[in-house]
């Protein structure tokens, strides 16, 4: 009876050692770091991406900061880009060299309100946009533009806050936009 318990113990220990050895072997094979760095225990500096659900409305100010769209889509699971109505999806995908397998994370809309409706349905943890890109410039004085300004601001303030977890409205200067977006994309 004792020899059976001992044999079972040694068998399980050998199986565990074999599993551990295989996992170490697999990590060496699949690692993109040079083996000399792994052996020394030195890690290359890599960006750590968010694990949160993030939705970003891509408007002119987001395009201006030139985010690495392909890299972000490839390395994150739950980041979605919603395109403003002024941005064509095909052109956006081509300019940012987005793989066709990742294009489902880029959503095209036809209207400004449509962008915000998409945010409601995505139900992301962080919803990032620059409302100033959707509002007419202050130099225009048309009553239609004033009505659009009022309606969009009212819509965002009254309706979106009821549906979205965290609304992150971007500042107007490009440096602050870059810092704010990076804060939510990278850990």
UniProtKB/Swiss-Prot annotation:
InterPro entries, sorted: Peroxin-22, Peroxin-22_C_sf
Membrane topology type: Single-pass membrane protein
Record's GO cellular component terms: peroxisomal membrane
Keywords: Membrane, Peroxisome, Peroxisome biogenesis, Transmembrane, Transmembrane helix
Localization terms from the record: Peroxisome membrane
GO biological process: peroxisome organization
Signal peptide per UniProt: none
Chain ranges passing through the membrane: 7-29
Subunit-level organization: Interacts with PEX4.
Protein family membership: Belongs to the peroxin-22 family.
Primary role: Involved in peroxisome biogenesis.
Designated name of the protein: Peroxisome assembly protein 22
Organism: Komagataella pastoris (Yeast)
Lineage: Eukaryota, Fungi, Dikarya, Ascomycota, Saccharomycotina
